[in-house]
Amino acid sequence: MEHAEQIYQRLVEICGERNVLRDEPMKNHTLVRIGGKADFLVWPETYEQVIEVLRLKEEYGLPFTLLGNGSNVIIRDGGLRGIVMQLKHLNRIWREGNNVIAQSGADIKAVSRFALEQHLTGLEFACGIPGSVGGAIMMNAGAYGGEVKDVLDHVKVATLSGELKTLKNEELELGYRTSLISRTHDIVLEVVFALRPGDYAQIKAKMDDLTFQRESKQPLEYPSVGSVFKRPPGYFAGKLIQDSGLQGKGFGGAEVSTKHAGFIINKNNATAADYIATIEMVRKTVKEKFGVDLELEVKIIGEE
């Protein structure tokens, strides 16, 4: 890459040496443990650093990828060019009135637990969702009958050119696993959840029940991206895959889970190519058997 050393030094000036990695294998930073190298991986510690990195990206015309905690993404084996940013240091969670405010890099499960500790109800559904707050907003994450849309008040974002703005719930076009931000690629910095006072014991009982359901049904013992496919109208993706006889099948180190057919696991050092080939096998087979097109919930990014 042209100016690679210069770009690295500028990134170090902005974020500090410990927060900038070069040629970093992204399999170290995704929950599925798959992914080629990123040219530069940066972890800003302040909103100002986020803005400065964005301006640097603009100055050099670099490709840019924002990654949450790597839970809902497959990075191809060729990796990611330019700058990859994770906001793991921006992870504060606090309360103002009945609102819980969280920075983008906080774990959505941690926000759910914080709400419980504060005797606030509304985020129980998120107690088992693997992902960052920013990722949860982008995907309008949901589970067990609840979704982000139900409790979101507003978000603070940075545009890709480095401008700050506030967007209200109704401006975010939150739908089933989609949002305006998933199309504009604005960077979520801070989120305000509007919750209600509740009974601690009742909130905890609901969270315990949802956690039990999740642990008993999902293959949490292996790396995965979580739920691979969106729910097709009138069907359940996992049931279609199960009825297609695909459990235990796959390519290379990737395999359709025998515990929950909606999950594809990294059973043995799978590559992105293995994982994507397994996805395509599932889609093709389900289409042939049932005439249903399975749409991806997971994002596939990076170079071949």
Curated annotation (Swiss-Prot):
It is found in: Cytoplasm. Keywords: Cell cycle, Cell division, Cell shape, Cell wall biogenesis/degradation, Cytoplasm, FAD, Flavoprotein, NADP, Oxidoreductase, Peptidoglycan synthesis. It holds the Pfam family MurB_C. It comes from the Bacteria. Its cofactor is FAD. Pathway: Cell wall biogenesis; peptidoglycan biosynthesis. Cell wall formation. NCBIfam families: murB, PRK13905.1. HAMAP family: MurB. This is UDP-N-acetylenolpyruvoylglucosamine reductase. It comes from Geobacillus kaustophilus (strain HTA426).
